[in-house]
Amino acid sequence: MSTQGLVQLLANAQCHLRTSTNYNGVHTQFNSALNYKNNGTNTIDGSEAWCSSIVDTNQYIVAGCEVPRTFMCVALQGRGDADQWVTSYKIRYSLDNVSWFEYRNGAAVTGVTDRNTVVNHFFDTPIRARSIAIHPLTWNGHISLRCEFYTQPVQSSVTQVGADIYTGDNCALNTGSGKREVVVPVKFQFEFATLPKVALNFDQIDCTDATNQTRIGVQPRNITTKGFDCVFYTWNENKVYSLRADYIATALE
């Protein structure tokens, strides 16, 4: 499996980090990103990992997001400047930051065996959560780690609405018999990034039929990110003087 196409939360600053304890002010979660390096010439940059101050199985590092994310993978790495790393851990997660659940019912996930090798663990099924936590279970030397969480890209709904799509007076649907249609090109106010879905509804109908059966329809055709064709149609003996419609277009971007 590959992390290609996934979003790195820590590397892209898309989450907040909190820890159970920190060894001191320069051994905090700020040093926990994968491949973090200090400058090697002073102690200001601190350790090349998050390091807990207490060494027991109650320690954790948690990543919290402003909106729920779909977590696909977690990556773990040891401390770059000392022989300290986490050899096994469990994952806990929450959708509301109140009720927490354990991945694989709290079973241990294999960690790392040296300072710098990155070990990815892809979840059995995607985890939908707002917050997710690593709880070290066993370790070498000290609880120290660098990590990353990979998620699906966040998609937001973008909507545009439009009105007054009009066939014109005494349109082509007002003569003849059988299936007839009038096509009205529609241009969106701005271009979508992805192909939208378009829904149409009538707001004016002016038609008649000798059998008292109104047969009309409207549908989108040739949808692009820039616009679509609005197709008004009728069939049989219906006489349609004019039709008017509105649209709503929505895309996930």
UniProtKB/Swiss-Prot annotation:
Subcellular localization(s) per the UniProt record: Cytoplasm
Expression (tissue specificity): Stalk cells.
Positions bearing N-acetylserine: S2
The keyword Cytoplasm appears for this protein: yes
UniProt keyword list: Acetylation, Cell adhesion, Cytoplasm, Lectin
Major localisation: cytoplasm
One of the GO BP terms on file: cortical cytoskeleton organization
Source domain of life: Eukaryota
Entries under CDD domains matching the protein: FA58C
Gene Ontology CC annotation, any one: symbiont cell surface
Signal peptide: none
InterPro entries: FA58C (IPR000421), Galactose-bd-like_sf (IPR008979), Galactose-binding_lectin (IPR052487), H-type_lectin_dom_sf (IPR037221), H-type_lectin_domain (IPR019019)
A Pfam cross-reference name: H_lectin
Domain F5/8 type C: 2-152
Motif Cell attachment site boundaries: 79-81
Single GO MF annotation: polysaccharide binding
PANTHER family, A to Z: DISCOIDIN-1 SUBUNIT A-RELATED (PTHR46938:SF1), DISCOIDIN-1 SUBUNIT A-RELATED-RELATED (PTHR46938)
Subunit structure: Tetramer of four different chains (A to D).
Function: Galactose- and N-acetylgalactosamine-binding lectin. May play a role in cell-substratum adhesion rather than in cell-cell adhesion. May be necessary for the maintenance of normal elongate morphology during aggregation.
Name of the molecule in the record: Discoidin-1 subunit A
Native organism: Dictyostelium discoideum
Gene: dscA-1
